[in-house]
């Protein structure tokens, strides 16, 4: 009996020293995650006040992390809710790893959709919320120039703001205004 115990103890020590990973050593990679979102209506006295958006991130081990967003405080019953809570995966910080962009809704009838963005941090193996001084509307990613382009429209006025990364922060570096007809000509 002592021989079996010592042999088992020796085998466990050998496995522990061999560097084999145990389930406790699991570090999630970005590619391990599956994503889904859920838009929940919060009622106050029967009226829609806002929608809460929850993004569920489930890793390869089945562990789920939640990211919370708040949809714009509009009477969303009057809006097309089709894109609210929609998740897109784009590389916002140009590190080659997809980040998450969650639509929080339109600012007005011209679109001007706003988004919450979470960047994958490959050192901490977690998503971290993007902090930006400005509001980014209807964003597009310009991979060639490594910038994020924000477009705001109101009537015939269009404002385009370009953001670039500087010292780990997304900062505005160019702003231009034009008419929608000028934009259509480009």
Each model region followed by its residue ranges:
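Calcium-binding motifs, dominated by EF-hand helix-loop-helix domains
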Residues: 88-92
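Acidic, small-residue rich beta-repeat scaffolds with periodic aromatic anchors
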Residues: 5-8, 16-56, 139-186
